[in-house]
């Protein structure tokens, strides 16, 4: 039995010798590479926190002591050490989540995955412990250096520093990267600490001196290394950043030296007040393919060959992010006023190609979505047209800025929302299912959802031409479907994708739901029911021709991959009522609940968004066995199908 297999909980670590702990770290890395290679997941971040996580669980008593991970994608090691070693279905339906999840374990305190929130959680939890007389309980917040670029971190530190009676330890996992190399003034400061000659050279010189003494020297070094780190950190004056906050600072500490980390954490634990432990780590540690990956050191991978790190399976199809990456560069070639903004996600959003071509016209603001949006408003005021590329789920963080800084000021800013709708394996915090409901209430906003690459190019060009209002383009994660050509385009830009002589059902599809709408129409036709399928292209505001078409049909069905409540269907229903059109409306979308990790197809199936389920329900409505929403059919129609309908069904 391996050492890892003998670890069923954190207290099993207590009996391990130093040599066994080092062996455990090696086994954990081998386990992660072998298993994440099969399922995909966040590999690089977890390889970088193995020793640090082991040390945390040896020094603190989870779950009595609360351990909170910022951007919890680096919690795989934590899962392994708390009895969850079945990674065979990691990030798959019914398997382990890719982030902390309370339903999995009492050791998962916060279901974190959005950056920069852990210190606020830690502030609140530690205050609660203090106020309820649980003074012997500690809170440990593990935060990456990338998250230090987020404003919430500093808001929390401001409050934490105001109360020095709490047992709160902040472990800064400093690997110089978030997705890619961390940027900004904070990153430069930490890099100075990480590489400062006064610390690094003295530490290495001292270590080598002990190692020259052979076995006895190495034993002596292991015994005093924690003190050595503390002495050298004070000598090299690395506390400057936190001195005015009145928070104790320990470090920098070698984050891959379990003994040194334990010593630093025990010092922090015994201090009895908020302490920052600054751990220097290496993303992708111990896995050569990750270390060779300069772009993001295997931050997140699909299925790979564990020996080489090369992707396996069929060649990747063109994806939405790639289409955006190409098209924004093409538009920028023609329009020198186009600039790009991203929040620490240059490559994941596709703006890296823009940066390569126009390095002076792209801005990475760090993990600071609110700042990104208001900065974009300022750029627009100065005569530029900013394109803010961001994941849909992270757009939620900057709603006030979109509303008050962009829309109120009629600023021409384009938001490109990647990973909109169901994203699949990353779970509830990463599904981009709220953007339609949230953003459609913003006055003056225009919102597009392209169904394919050709429509994306059209709509992006249209969006960046708008100079007096915010525009939004949203698209899902994954490969781009084949182009779906319109039968005809109406004067206001609405594409008719399919039409029938019988005007029974109008299917209004949002973006990538167009293909589903066409399959539903085909299934309805087999039952003698006529359907028209339209893609509004720009779904907010609702184009007038959608209302006109609705007036000529018996039922309108809206289909979107966002939440039903407050979504585009709600907007269509409201506009129809205001226009005096009483056509029944059936709004199809996702439930207003947090959806667990699974594939996109599995989630859509669970929500009833399949051709068979939708068609079956519509047949019941049209042929009379179920009353459609909003406008009941005449009694004679839903109690007994007309002879004409009986004939068509036959």
Swiss-Prot record:
EC number: 2.2.1.7
SUPFAM superfamilies, A to Z: Thiamin diphosphate-binding fold (THDP-binding), TK C-terminal domain-like
Sites where the protein binds thiamine diphosphate: 73, 113-115, 146-147, 175, 287, 369
GO molecular function, one term: magnesium ion binding
Enzyme superclass (EC): transferase
Reactions it catalyzes: D-glyceraldehyde 3-phosphate + pyruvate + H(+) = 1-deoxy-D-xylulose 5-phosphate + CO2
Keywords carried by this UniProt record: Isoprene biosynthesis, Magnesium, Metal-binding, Thiamine biosynthesis, Thiamine pyrophosphate, Transferase
Cofactor note: Binds 1 Mg(2+) ion per subunit.
GO cellular component, one term: cytosol
CDD domains assigned: TPP_DXS (cd02007), TPP_PYR_DXS_TK_like (cd07033)
UniProt pathway: Metabolic intermediate biosynthesis; 1-deoxy-D-xylulose 5-phosphate biosynthesis; 1-deoxy-D-xylulose 5-phosphate from D-glyceraldehyde 3-phosphate and pyruvate: step 1/1
Cofactor(s) required for function per UniProt: Mg(2+); thiamine diphosphate
Residues at which Mg(2+) binds: 145, 175
GO biological process: 1-deoxy-D-xylulose 5-phosphate biosynthetic process; isopentenyl diphosphate biosynthetic process, methylerythritol 4-phosphate pathway; terpenoid biosynthetic process; thiamine biosynthetic process
Function statement: Catalyzes the acyloin condensation reaction between C atoms 2 and 3 of pyruvate and glyceraldehyde 3-phosphate to yield 1-deoxy-D-xylulose-5-phosphate (DXP).
Assigned protein family: Belongs to the transketolase family. DXPS subfamily.
Protein name: 1-deoxy-D-xylulose-5-phosphate synthase
Organism: Leifsonia xyli subsp. xyli (strain CTCB07)
Encoding gene per record: dxs
């Amino acid at each position: 039995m391996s050492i890892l297999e003998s670890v069923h909980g954190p207290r099993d670590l207590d009996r391990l010798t130093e040599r066994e702990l080092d062996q455990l770290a090696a086994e954990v890395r081998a386990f992660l590479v072998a298993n994440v290679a099969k399922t995909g997941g966040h590999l690089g971040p977890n390889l970088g926190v193995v020793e640090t996580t082991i040390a945390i669980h040896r020094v603190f008593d989870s779950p009595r002591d609360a351990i909170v991970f910022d951007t919890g994608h680096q919690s795989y090691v934590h899962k392994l050490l708390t009895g969850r070693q079945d990674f065979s279905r990691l990030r798959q339906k019914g398997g382990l989540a890719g982030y902390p999840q309370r339903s999995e374990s009492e050791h998962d305190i916060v279901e974190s995955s959005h950056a920069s929130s852990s210190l606020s959680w830690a502030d609140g939890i530690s205050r609660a412990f203090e106020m309820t007389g649980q003074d012997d309980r500690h809170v440990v917040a593990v935060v990456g250096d990338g998250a230090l670029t987020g404003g919430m971190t500093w808001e929390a530190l401001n409050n934490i520093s105001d109360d020095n009676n709490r047992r709160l330890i902040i472990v800064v996992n400093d690997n110089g990267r978030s997705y890619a190399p961390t940027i900004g003034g904070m990153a430069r400061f930490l890099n100075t600490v990480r590489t400062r000659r006064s610390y690094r050279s003295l530490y290495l010189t001292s270590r080598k001196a002990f190692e020259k003494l052979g076995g006895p020297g190495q034993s002596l070094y292991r015994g005093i290394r924690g003190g050595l780190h503390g002495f050298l950190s004070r000598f090299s004056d690395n506390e400057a950043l936190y001195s005015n906050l009145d928070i104790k600072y320990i470090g920098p500490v070698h984050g891959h030296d379990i003994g040194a980390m334990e010593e630093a954490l025990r010092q922090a634990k015994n201090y009895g007040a908020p302490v920052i432990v600054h751990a220097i780590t290496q993303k992708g540690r111990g896995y050569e393919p990750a270390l060779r990956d300069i772009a993001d050191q295997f931050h997140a991978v699909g299925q790979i060959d564990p020996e080489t790190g090369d992707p396996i399976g069929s060649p990747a199809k063109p994806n939405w992010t790639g289409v955006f990456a190409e098209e924004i560069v093409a538009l920028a070639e023609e329009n020198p006023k186009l600039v790009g903004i991203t929040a620490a996600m240059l490559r994941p959003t596709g703006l890296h190609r823009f940066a390569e071509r126009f390095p002076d016209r792209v801005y990475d603001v760090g993990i600071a979505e609110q700042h990104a949006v208001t900065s974009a408003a300022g750029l627009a005021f100065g005569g530029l047209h900013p394109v803010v590329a961001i994941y849909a789920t992270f757009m939620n963080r900057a709603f006030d800025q979109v509303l008050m800084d962009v829309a109120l000021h009629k600023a021409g800013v384009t938001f490109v929302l990647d990973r909109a709708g169901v994203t699949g394996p990353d779970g509830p915090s990463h599904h981009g299912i709220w953007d339609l409901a949230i953003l459609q209430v913003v006055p003056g906003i225009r919102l597009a959802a392209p169904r394919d690459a050709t429509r994306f190019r059209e709509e992006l060009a249209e969006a960046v031409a708008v100079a007096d209002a915010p525009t939004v383009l949203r698209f899902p994660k994954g490969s781009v479907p084949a182009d779906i050509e319109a039968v005809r385009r109406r004067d206001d830009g609405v594409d008719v994708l399919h039409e029938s002589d019988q005007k029974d059902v109008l299917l209004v599809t949002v973006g990538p739901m167009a293909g589903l709408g066409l399959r539903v129409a085909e299934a309805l036709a087999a039952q003698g029911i006529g359907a028209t399928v339209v893609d509004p292209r720009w779904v907010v505001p609702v184009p007038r021709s959608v209302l006109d078409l609705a007036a000529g049909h018996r039922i309108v069905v809206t289909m979107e991959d966002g939440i039903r409540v407050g979504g585009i269907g709600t907007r269509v229903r409201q506009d129809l009522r205001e226009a005096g059109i009483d056509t029944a409306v059936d709004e199809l979308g996702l439930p207003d609940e947090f959806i667990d990790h699974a594939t996109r197809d599995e989630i859509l199936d669970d929500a009833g968004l399949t051709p068979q389920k939708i068609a079956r329900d519509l047949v019941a409505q049209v042929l009379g066995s179920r009353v459609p929403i909003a406008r009941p059919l005449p009694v004679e129609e839903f109690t007994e199908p007309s002879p004409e309908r009986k004939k068509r069904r036959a």
